[in-house]
Amino acid sequence: MATRAVARRQPAASGETGAAGSVRATGEIADRDLVGMYLDEIARTPLLDAAKEVELSQTIEAGVYAGKILDGEVDSDSAGASREELEALVAEGERAKDVFIRSNLRLVVAVARRYPRSGLPLLDLIQEGNAGLVRAVEKFDYAKGFKFSTYATWWIRQAITRSIADQSRTIRLPVHLVEELGRIRRVQREFNRENGRDPEPAEIAAELSSTPERVTDVLDWARDPVSLNMSVDDEGETQFGDLLEDTSAVSPEQSVLTLLRSEELDDLIGQLDDRTASIIKMRYGIEDGRERTLTEVGKQHGLTRERIRQIEKHALLELKRMAHDTGFDAAA
């Protein structure tokens, strides 16, 4: 997997040669080649149907339970199995987990590609998403009745967006840029004190014998904090502020357990009008496991993205209210 990169591309140093630019371009081509190789590799693993997901989940569950017996967390007398049999169950569970993960790696790529403006290479996003997928496999409860792809998408997205947010907090400037930024800031302060306003890039450049473009590059690179309104996904639906942790929010798992139990959700959605029900099903991939963007749903229904967003928000509040009234949320 590619080495983690900083969240923004570093501006070229003054006087950068064409050779340096060629090296960067070659690196970008190499990254694309690696992505292609990775996609070819994971495409060899067949997708799972619902029955196979249940079978693998049961094998994983048995392996976890056997491991607890071996570790003394569960009374071994109640198991009725030898140590060798328990160790075999643990090994089978690990193999099942590996198959489950490898069969869903394409889902990670699909989610990672939604964040082309994140500033992170696609391979890094995939690596973070894979960690979310592993967590989803470990936490998935097949007995709840909801689709694994829908459940896993929450964990994959959480891992990716958290990584994007973390990267923004750990951006570090090279020494030469720190010094250059210091000179720019000094000119800004002096100019503001003398003129009562902030200087334009051209005015700063004149003081430093630089160029307006160079000043803009350095300021853009060093800007902190990143604009909370900066779009990071392909559809403009996720802004940087959406990635910052909300400690008061329920976890993705809690949200899924509350809203995505298939039988209960069908009952609740059945109480919505046809258009709203269709929008919710498309947005969350309830019927086919593929989540649609606001734009896709809007085109399907002849509505704007903003109108779809409003309908979705109202519908989720209504579903939450109905779940509370019927006691579904209490059972989650």
Swiss-Prot record:
Q: Where are the transmembrane segments?
A: none
- Taken from the record, one Pfam family name reads Sigma70_r3
Respond yes or no to whether keyword DNA-binding is given for this record. yes
Mention one GO molecular function. sigma factor activity
Q: Which domain of life is it from?
A: Bacteria
Recorded hits in InterPro entries, A to Z, give: RNA_pol_sigma-70_dom, RNA_pol_sigma70, RNA_pol_sigma70_r1_2, RNA_pol_sigma70_r2, RNA_pol_sigma70_r3, RNA_pol_sigma70_r4, RNA_pol_sigma_r2, RNA_pol_sigma_r3/r4-like
Spell out the residue ranges making up region: Disordered.
Answer: 1-21
Keyword flag Zinc: no
One of its GO biological process terms is: DNA-templated transcription initiation
Q: Kindly list the cysteine pairs connected by disulfide bridges.
A: none
Query: Where's the DNA-binding part?
Result: 294-313
Q: What does this protein do?
A: Sigma factors are initiation factors that promote the attachment of RNA polymerase to specific initiation sites and are then released.
Please state which protein family the record places this protein in.
Answer: Belongs to the sigma-70 factor family.
What the entry lists under NCBIfam families is as follows: sigma70-ECF
In its UniProt entry, what is this protein called?
RNA polymerase principal sigma factor HrdD
Lineage in the entry?
Bacteria, Bacillati, Actinomycetota, Actinomycetes, Kitasatosporales
Q: What's the encoding gene here?
A: hrdD
